[in-house]
């Protein structure tokens, strides 16, 4: 329940404390769904990133967030962002969200930071488009097809966007079926 839920946060020992880069995933799942994908995969991704980042000295402070009660209405991330002082909020330069990134029948979605598809939700805060482009460049270099997905408010990037913090991230699909175009690109 949200009342008994907690967030778990960790951060790099190195890096500029005035330039914080955050990566997060939610810890909970719904009873009816496959918790291993939603969101064991996002949690594992952020944890592995933290383990790899421990081997380097990043220029920016890196904060890893494992959110409680996302499935109950983004409770953990909302409380975290709401509790930030203005000064602490200004130090967070970007937030990367990883929710359902290991679907067994995936589509490679990148959060659409600049509303480049021109449909659905508007662009994210300034800086979100740059995050989208970084992921697009990576996928292009790897010759992996990708598609934009709207910031529809259904995951923990929501409170950060509302606070004006640039956001980005990856997603491999949820309850929807693939379109015919997606099935051609990714199989299934």
Language model features with spans:
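Metal-dependent peptidase/peptidase-like ectodomains
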Residues: 1, 17-18, 31, 58, ...
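Asparagine-centered polar/low-complexity signal
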Residues: 7, 37-39, 97
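His/Asp/Glu-rich mid-to-C-terminal helical/loop segments that flank catalytic regions of hydrolases
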Residues: 51, 62, 173-188
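Short, conserved micro-motifs enriched in small and acidic residues
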Residues: 33-44, 71
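Buried hydrophobic packing segments
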Residues: 45-49, 53, 77-80
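Soluble metallo-hydrolase cores and metallopeptidase-like ectodomains found primarily
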Residues: 1-35, 48-51, 59
């Amino acid at each position: 329940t949200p009342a008994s839920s907690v967030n778990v946060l960790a951060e790099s020992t190195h890096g500029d404390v005035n330039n914080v880069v955050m990566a997060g995933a939610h810890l909970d799942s719904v009873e009816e769904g496959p918790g291993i994908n939603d969101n064991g995969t996002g949690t594992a991704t952020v944890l592995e990133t933290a383990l790899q980042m421990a081997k380097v000295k990043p220029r920016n402070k890196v904060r890893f967030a494992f959110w409680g009660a996302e499935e109950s209405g983004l409770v953990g991330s909302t409380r975290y962002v709401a509790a930030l002082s203005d000064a602490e909020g200004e130090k967070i330069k970007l937030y990367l969200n990883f929710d359902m990134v290991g679907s067994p029948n995936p589509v490679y979605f990148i959060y659409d930071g600049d509303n480049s598809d021109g449909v659905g939700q508007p662009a994210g805060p300034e800086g979100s488009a740059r995050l989208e482009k970084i992921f697009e460049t990576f996928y292009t270099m790897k010759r992996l097809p990708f598609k934009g997905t709207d910031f529809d408010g259904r995951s923990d990037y929501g409170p950060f966007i509302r606070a004006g913090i640039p956001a980005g991230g990856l997603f491999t699909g949820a309850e929807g079926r693939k379109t015919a175009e997606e099935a051609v690109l990714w199989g299934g």
